[in-house]
């Protein structure tokens, strides 16, 4: 079957019909089977926020005479056939293990009798799917995701079932190659629509409408706002358009597209940061009645727009706004079936939205993978009801893990996302924090550098803050900690800690000889968890100095506690500690952990000779609660560092040379004395300059 290929020119340039591009696709952001933000992350942390999509490439169109049309296609093109009406899916969930499979499930559920037209978008891209949702809405067509070079057997089977007269491949020049187009053309004629920018893509979708509308819902370049505009257009018989609304004037191409719809009213969907007041004024000057709907909270905003549906909906599509492909599918389904779409947390239904759905007598259709949208959403369980249950479940699981070990545990876990789950056991019990107390000293010194009252070259005693701050966290050096406490004073550091809300944290008095570590310092896991929570949220220091302290914690070398209880590759920033007390060896650790859907902080202090592996087990339990079970946890080499060059080995810090450590050798660091690290190298235990070592 020969594909009908259409190239849409860049704005202002003539176009030409030609085969689809065969060059390799430009890399775009992708999601693994279990999505991760990026991480962009992203990536809200707050839930990890949606990563900023990579701008799409601009294909160059060379003006040429119109090509000859093959004889077999010489007749006048027919008007697009009306689409088959979509139905509201009967089930509570459109899940599946991948976005490709999820789109197929949505197609089967909403278009059981087939479809005249099918819209396909590159499912490895992050921008095209949402823009394609608008086209699917305007053509009353299902939306499927494919890869640039071909289609899976599942998608092929669904296309055969739908039996479309036309498949529309909607994307940039790089979104489809020759193999992908040929695979589609083997099923039905392909209409290839290419675009070079978000506004252009949206105008093309708008122009595909065959019926006039009274109202156009206009959004800026934010994809979530555009998806909400698509949904609102579907429930109110309007149309949606995405524009570059940051400027002060409206492009002529945009005005022409709006005028072709026959609309007299425009509703701006989003704040002035997306569509400026000057831009809205330009629309009014062109003769449109302009109003605006906006809210800084995407969950509240989606509810606000869903309330505009004229009738009590049969169902609400619920999606996680952090998963762009589910946002696209939700918008397409919403518009096709005339049912509103709402955004919600991944753990439960946003409480105010739950109340509205309950009042309407409607049901929920969850669109998303279970790990990114839990079943409590399908049940319309309000977060106010789900949060206590989740907190109790986490506490029970942590207690069960702790019960496997002798000793006494104190711990606090706080989720940093929207729900802010929190649980603790003996979280307010004052205990010796061991080396975790160094976080307070590091903060106090960095705050002075940030404020300009000290510099990186300031020497509390014999070593600069540049060196002291690094080794105090990286290798848990006690000497630099003592130096900073002597410099600032234990009473002042206590006041600083308590000014941060650490009401149960205080330093003892620095002895004339000996370390502050044994001076009777006290803190709680509640205080320590609250400290790193504020650090991660940027509430303690400027972004620059927040990053510096967090990087120290991320790169510290004693990672056999919390860091060894989470999956490989998961970001953690931690500060462990250990101290001999009367009941035996105290073990502690406090960490920030960033998972795929949210982040959490955890602080643990265990007494009575508890092994480090117990802290790893508690971290694993917490991680599993938030993100699901996983296989082997991360492991770190006993020899944490590697020499970068030949360096003298010494009998003591700065002492006599007893040999040479060659470059490129792995070594185990056991302790530190300011710039000097004590290492095990083979059978030798010696001291070397830490600047000759790097993390493995």
Locate the predicted segments by residue:
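Short, well-structured active-site flanking segments
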Residues: 140-145, 340, 447-466, 542-543
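Active-site SXXK
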Residues: 131, 135, 430-456, 472, ...
